A protein has these predicted regions:
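Short coil/turn linking the two alpha-helices of tandem helical-hairpin repeats
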Residues: 69, 74-81, 111, 116-121, ...
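Alpha-helical segment of the N-proximal tetratricopeptide repeat
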Residues: 26-57, 77
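Flexible helix-coil transition and linker loops at the boundaries of alpha-helical arrays
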Residues: 20-24, 56-62, 95-105, 135-150
């Protein structure tokens, strides 16, 4: 009888753990969704809270890490922010990529961070590589946050080449962008800059 009681208690415990994991999974997904809602409403501090909750419940949620990165990156564009926020964004994008190497949005976020950081030329080289990785990754992730077209991504790549002093590569990319989208204002402005 004692053996049956022990088995019953163990089974009850195991089943409750499965239910807890399902609950945590649902709650982490809900927090991730809430984070993107807050992000899209430009409430970056609340987005951070929601994404942090999601990650604490499920550290493997690539898009929650990605959301943390984009929220930090968006906050870094506010005056009087410091390099620590950029570093947090970078770490979040790297965590997103570790969880899912096909997360092209996280690769683009990482490229943005490296471009903004500008500590050394290798930042621009790494940003270009991140863009290449994004272009080779899952296209379903594209255009969800802060980018409207593939042209925008190529323009970022062109800016990186420009800052590396590789104006020929930068100009080549801009010409390609303008062939497909002759009215693209960013590409037109960069072309003028490259003419100097």
């Amino acid at each position: 009888m004692r053996k049956i009681t022990v088995i019953f208690v163990c089974l009850t415990f195991l089943l409750s753990c499965v239910a807890d994991r399902d609950f945590d999974s649902n709650l982490s997904s809900k927090n991730q969704e809430d984070g993107w809602v807050e992000y899209n409403q430009n409430d970056f501090p609340q987005a951070l809270v929601a994404f942090e909750r999601a990650v604490s419940l499920n550290p493997n949620l690539s898009d929650a890490h990605n959301g943390l990165g984009w929220a930090h990156l968006s906050m870094s564009q506010v005056p009087n922010t410091n390099t620590q926020i950029i570093a947090k964004a970078q770490r979040s994008f790297q965590d997103a990529i570790l969880a899912d190497t096909q997360n092209s949005d996280a690769w683009i976020g990482l490229a943005n961070v490296l471009f903004l950081r500008r500590q050394k030329p290798s930042d621009f080289e790494a940003a270009i590589q991140a863009i290449e990785n994004a272009l080779a990754a899952d296209r379903d992730y594209f255009f969800r946050h802060d980018y409207d077209s593939i042209a925008d991504i190529h323009i970022l790549k062109s800016f990186c080449y420009y800052h590396l002093g590789k104006k020929t590569q930068a100009d080549s990319i801009i010409r390609t962008v303008l062939k497909s989208d002759p009215t693209n204002q960013s590409a037109t402005q960069l072309k003028k800059l490259l003419a100097f």
